[in-house]
Amino acid sequence: MSNSVPVIAVDAMGGDHGPSIVVPGAVRAARENSLKLILVGDKDAISAELNRLPLDGVAYDIVHASQVAGMEEKPSDILRRKKDASVQVACRLVRSGDADGIVSAGNSGATVACGMFIMGRIPGVERPALASVMPTEKKPCVLLDVGANVDCKPYHLFQFGLMAEAFARDLLEIETPRVGLLSIGEEEGKGNSQVKEAYELLREAKNINFVGNIEGCDLFTGNVDVAVCDGFVGNVALKLSEGLASSLARLLKRELLTGIKAKIGTFLARDAFRRFARFVDYAEYGGAPLLGLQGIAIVCHGASNEKAIASAVGMAGTFVSKGTYHHLVETISANEELTSYGKAVKQ
């Protein structure tokens, strides 16, 4: 779009709580960032939520959508039978140029499918992929893919690395992000056949700081800025880290509230605990960007709270302002020859 202010289409009906969480979260993002909202969904339900909120300085439009993509519905059914579903309408706004990006906490499979078939893919990209931001001892690390593609060929992993590197440049504000390939050992020859072939492609990539193989423990050390893997491995790693963080938090809380000395120590260290809680809070980033589409798309968890929605909408606006989509296009185009070579190699 030519408009200098990012315009973000928000699927107001998505998520476990629909407009009651999504609308306040989106409005919060619009107040905290320079962007315009297009709230997509049931007009009456959206208006009812807006009437409860302070809207001074908030630029927004409402686009009515009569249908909702159910969380348990098949993405293919939603694409074929629910043309007026809020997520479909939001994606069409991006395709038509009326919006720069979409944010949805609804059916993630439907969001991915609608993004691919309505918004379309960046020329040369075969598999759009979901990125997740992982907290580390230093700066965050971008993990890609975390669930959009469970079966991948080597050149898919190669393209994931290209897209994640361009994305990390804007997100982490690092000129040359360090890109690692997740494997079972750091040595060059480690990994299955797909990983080994992807290694060779990434090593030859233009303008990519490829540091070689990394292991699972490297996800949290901060020694790489980008970790590349297929969606099966990435989703397992993501859910494992989320589960571990939740379990450790519960264990820590239980131990810190046992006995008067522990309670006093907890009180004295409360600021440190608050910083740690923010550090591991998924709501700080809000959602997983779906990279490889012709536009910005952020997929949020169905259980997202207001803060998570606000973070996701704000992130979408930031990526529009920074030209992240164009950076992805440039990176993919610069490595088109290697991608073609990877496709030609017998899989």
Curated annotation (Swiss-Prot):
One of its GO terms (molecular function) is phosphate:acyl-[acyl carrier protein] acyltransferase activity. GO terms for biological process: fatty acid biosynthetic process; phospholipid biosynthetic process. Its EC number is 2.3.1.274. Disulfide bonds: none annotated. The keyword Amino-acid biosynthesis does not apply. It is an enzyme of class 2 (transferase). It is found in: Cytoplasm. One of its GO terms (cellular component) is cytoplasm. Keywords: Cytoplasm, Lipid biosynthesis, Lipid metabolism, Phospholipid biosynthesis, Phospholipid metabolism, Transferase. Gene3D superfamilies: Isopropylmalate Dehydrogenase (3.40.718.10). InterPro entries: FA_synthesis, Phospholipid_synth_PlsX-like. Pfam families: FA_synthesis. It catalyses: a fatty acyl-[ACP] + phosphate = an acyl phosphate + holo-[ACP]. Pathway: Lipid metabolism; phospholipid metabolism. NCBIfam families: plsX. PANTHER family: FATTY ACID/PHOSPHOLIPID SYNTHESIS PROTEIN PLSX (PTHR30100), PHOSPHATE ACYLTRANSFERASE (PTHR30100:SF1). Catalyzes the reversible formation of acyl-phosphate (acyl-PO(4)) from acyl-[acyl-carrier-protein] (acyl-ACP). This enzyme utilizes acyl-ACP as fatty acyl donor, but not acyl-CoA. Homodimer. Probably interacts with PlsY. Belongs to the PlsX family. This is Phosphate acyltransferase. It comes from Oleidesulfovibrio alaskensis (strain ATCC BAA-1058 / DSM 17464 / G20) (Desulfovibrio alaskensis). The gene is plsX.
